Regions:
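Switch/communication elements of ASCE P-loop NTPase nucleotide-binding domains
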Residues: 1-28, 232-353, 369-370, 374-380, ...
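Extended helical coiled-coil dimerization/tether regions that scaffold
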Residues: 99, 171-257, 261-271, 295
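Surface-exposed acidic, glycine/proline-enriched linker/cap segments
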Residues: 42-59, 336-356
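Conserved P-loop NTP-binding catalytic core
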Residues: 22-91
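Acidic, Mg2+-coordinating catalytic modules of nucleic-acid enzymes
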Residues: 350-361, 369-512
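Short glycine-/polar-rich loops that comprise or flank the Walker A/P-loop
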Residues: 66-70, 92-97, 126-129, 149-150, ...
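Electropositive, glycine-dotted interaction segments
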Residues: 69, 75-203
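Conserved catalytic network of the ASCE P-loop NTPase/AAA+ motor domain
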Residues: 61-65, 89-92, 124, 263-267, ...
Length: 512
């Protein structure tokens, strides 16, 4: 990871949030704001692995019980010496922390009895499990204070109701107060409650209630404000923005304030983990927030998850960890340094599209994009993006740069390209990808139909071309000449027409 800023980019369900939660859990011992011991449940375990375990039991095998292991490897810093050792899965001498959820040996016999009938098992019986929290020196960790660094997890979007949002901000404000300020605020709040009883109208009400003594109770009844410990100032104080309760301002403003406050009061934190800072924010507001995060990062290590190409551009592609299918890679992992430089300079939108797509189709320009989009819709009854397939228009000179990322991410990618009158040249250009399991080069071998337009004429014939374009060309050559000179308009006509037409075979292969 980078020492300062790390932007984690990936599709939904790829594990971005899990990564942040795992780091925070290993360093704090807390999940969802509470100790792990009270937040343990069977669904913390990977469902596929649990199913595999149950299937193995059903097959008569004796697999090792499912377990969870989190390891956080830290920099070899003198301040972390007491965490240093080789008690980790890599067996390297480094500072670090491990947290495991594993079968408790004292319950091993009960566990074996429980799993003796695999047909009755659906989830992991966590009642037989224990939590083991240790540093790499092999010493048990009793409390997060035993770890000389602190992590703050900021996910304002999880606060769905007003009460939770208010408590969240009050807790942050409380952290920023000195001990004396907390005492002063608590005392002032109690005095304010005491003055409630001095109000004339309250006295009148209590005098009337006192007359009911003996009718309802033998004791005198009165009304007052709760001054018990449960009614502390934290429960009664509501944060305001310009005299409006925080819970009543816009969601975007709420989230921005929560993130900023958390960063301000996390000055002692060494690691800050921010979940999707862009939630509910406009372009301008997001710009201001990202600027604030960058300016206030200091020497702290920051992790931000995002789907936003703007965040990618603002914070820099060099900070990005491309996360997919539970693993992450960086652009610095690319073997070709010129490709690294290219994507460092390129606006992040197209890069993000390639990262987030389940499958991508790279085309040479807007005309090809329209034809591929419409061809896909005609075949599947919906647009490519509805299937997680992104059609990306790329300068032909940049094709191979995008393919390097596709191979790095193992993202299935089709290249729809012209043969430009030289199949041999095309094969030489993509020689490294012709046998790839990830990348497929789609082209036509007919060198006389070297671009999209003659390919459309070749596939559909002059009659269909005239019907689509609303023209009366008498020969294919004049039709092709017109189509080449009016690429965008022609592609749009093909996209919008109700006339039945077919895509060239090499495009059909890509929209399978």
């Amino acid at each position: 990871m980078n020492d300062n800023l790390n932007v984690i980019v990936g599709n939904n369900e790829c594990g971005k949030s899990t990564l942040l939660e795992a780091v925070h859990l290993a360093l704090s011992g807390q999940l969802n704001g509470r100790p792990l011991v009270v937040e343990m449940h069977p669904y913390l375990f990977n469902l596929d692995l649990v199913r595999k375990y149950i299937d193995s039991l059903a097959a008569g095998e004796k697999p090792h019980p499912p377990h969870i292991l989190l390891e956080v490897y830290l920099a070899d810093d003198p301040n972390l010496t007491k965490l240093k050792g080789d008690h980790n899965s890599l067996k390297i001498d480094r500072p670090g922390v491990s947290l495991s959820i594993e079968l408790n040996p004292s319950h091993a016999e009960d566990f074996i009895q429980y799993v003796s009938d695999p047909a009755e098992i659906r989830t992991v019986p966590i009642e037989y499990y224990r939590i083991v929290w240790r540093n790499f020196a092999g010493n048990d960790i009793a409390h997060s204070r035993d770890i000389p660094l602190h992590a703050s997890l900021i996910d304002a979007s999880t606060l769905k109701n007003n009460a939770a949002a208010s408590r969240y901000v009050v807790d942050i404000v409380k952290e920023s107060l000195s001990a004396q300020e907390k005492v002063d605020l608590a005392l002032t709040y109690r005095l304010m409650k005491d003055r409630f009883l001095e109000q004339p109208k309250v006295k009148t009400i209590n005098d009337a209630l006192a007359l009911k003594k003996g009718k309802i109770s033998e004791k005198t009844i009165s009304v007052s404000l709760d001054t018990s410990a449960r009614a502390s100032w934290e429960a009664g104080v509501m944060p305001h923005l310009d005299d409006i309760p925080l819970t009543l301002v816009g969601k975007g403003e709420q989230n921005a304030v929560k993130i900023k406050l958390a960063m301000e009061t996390s000055a002692k934190s060494h690691i800050i983990l921010i979940e999707e800072a862009e939630n509910h924010l406009s372009y301008a507001s997001l710009n201001e927030l990202i600027g604030h995060i960058s300016a206030n990062a200091g020497t702290r290590q920051i992790f931000i998850t995002t789907h936003s190409s703007f965040v990618l551009n603002k914070l820099g592609v060099e900070s990005v960890l491309l996360f997919q299918r539970g693993s992450g890679v960086r652009l610095s992992d690319l073997a070709n340094t010129s490709t690294q430089d290219y994507f460092m300079k390129l606006p992040g939108h197209d890069t993000l599209r390639l990262i987030l797509a389940k499958r991508s189709i790279l085309v040479e320009g807007p005309s090809d994009e329209l034809i591929v989009q419409r061809g896909y819709q005609k075949k599947h009854g919906k647009m490519p993006l509805e299937d997680g397939v992104d059609v990306i228009s790329v300068n032909s000179l940049a094709f191979k740069r995008f393919l390097e990322i596709a191979v790095l991410l193992k993202t299935e990618t089709d290249v729809v390209t012209d043969n430009d009158g030289s199949v041999a040249g095309l094969l030489a250009k993509y020689a490294n990808y012709l046998t790839s399991d990830v990348v497929k080069i789609r082209y036509d071998t007919d060198e006389t139909a070297k671009t999209l337009e003659p390919q459309l004429v070749k596939k559909n014939g002059l009659t269909t071309i005239n019907a689509v374009l609303g023209k009366t060309f008498t020969d294919e050559a004049s039709a092709i000449e017109y189509m080449v000179k009016n690429k965008a308009d022609v592609a749009l006509r093909f996209f919008e027409t109700t006339v039945d037409w077919s895509v060239p075979d090499y495009i059909a292969d890509a929209i399978r």
